[in-house]
Regions:
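Structural motif
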Residues: 17-19, 39, 48-50, 74-77, ...
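Alpha-helical support elements that line or immediately flank enzyme active sites
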Residues: 39-106, 152, 160-170, 194-203
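Short glycine-rich loop/turn motifs
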Residues: 35-40, 130-132
Length: 203
C-alpha cells in the first residue's frame, strides 16, 4: 500500500540504531565490443532467407526481419556467427532487415558491416546514473529499513533500465521496510542500450 514520504522517514528513523546515507554516480559508457555489427544475407527466389549475423539474439533477428520485410519467420533461418563481443549492445537489430531487402532486390547475397563510427552513432551506451541510498540498521548489523532513489539518463527518448536498478538494489536482503524509486531522465544525448544486465549493476 502507498506510504507517504514522512512515514518512510519515520520508519527508517524509528527502527534503526544507525542510519547511513550515500550517493553514487556512474558514467554512460559504450559496450566497446571488439568487432562491429555485421551480417551476410542470402534470399532465394522463393523468399527462403538465410542470415548469418553477429547478433546476440538470433530469434530477435528472425522476428524483426520478418516483421519489416513481410517474409514469414518459417522462411527465415538465422545462423549465429562469432559475436566478437557484445555485452548487451548486439541485442538490437540494425542491419539484417536492410540486407534482406537488398538481397531480395538484387538476387545476390548481401554483406553489411558497420564502421566503428556507425556503431557509436547508431547503437547506444548504457545509462549514466545518480543513486541515493539510505539504510537503517540495528547495532547487531541487522538491516531494518532501506530506501533507494535512482535517476537514470535515458537519452532523447524514454527507456532507461529503471526496473533493473530499482528491482535489484535491495533484493539480496530481507528488509522489513524497503522502498525504491526510479526516474527515467530524458536528456539531450543518444538513446541507451543494454549493457551487462541492464540497470542491475547500478542497483
Amino acid at each position: 500500500h502507498p506510504v507517504d514520504r514522512r512515514q518512510r522517514q519515520m520508519c527508517i528513523r524509528d527502527s534503526a540504531d544507525i542510519i547511513i546515507e550515500k550517493e553514487f554516480e556512474t558514467a554512460a559508457v559504450h559496450q566497446g565490443y571488439l568487432e562491429t555489427h555485421a551480417c551476410l544475407v542470402s534470399v532465394s527466389p522463393d523468399d527462403r532467407t538465410t542470415i548469418w549475423s553477429s547478433s546476440q539474439g538470433q530469434f530477435m533477428v528472425r522476428a524483426m526481419t520478418s516483421f519489416i520485410t513481410g517474409i514469414p519467420q518459417s522462411s527465415i533461418r538465422a545462423i549465429p556467427a562469432e559475436i566478437g563481443g557484445g555485452f548487451g549492445g548486439k541485442t538490437i537489430v540494425y542491419l539484417e532487415p536492410v540486407a534482406t531487402i537488398l538481397s531480395k532486390k538484387s538476387g545476390r547475397p548481401v554483406k553489411m558491416v558497420m564502421t566503428r563510427e556507425e556503431v557509436m552513432r547508431a547503437s547506444g551506451p548504457t545509462s549514466g546514473s545518480k543513486s541515493k541510498v539510505k539504510i537503517g540498521a540495528k547495532n547487531n548489523g541487522k538491516i531494518t529499513a532501506a530506501q533507494g532513489t535512482f535517476y537514470l539518463q535515458a537519452g532523447a527518448f524514454p527507456g532507461a533500465p529503471i526496473r533493473g536498478a530499482a528491482g535489484c538494489c535491495l533484493a539480496p536482503y530481507d528488509i522489513p521496510n524497503a522502498h525504491t524509486f526510479g526516474y527515467d531522465v530524458v536528456s539531450n544525448r543518444s538513446k541507451v542500450a543494454a549493457y551487462r544486465a541492464p540497470g542491475a549493476p547500478i542497483g
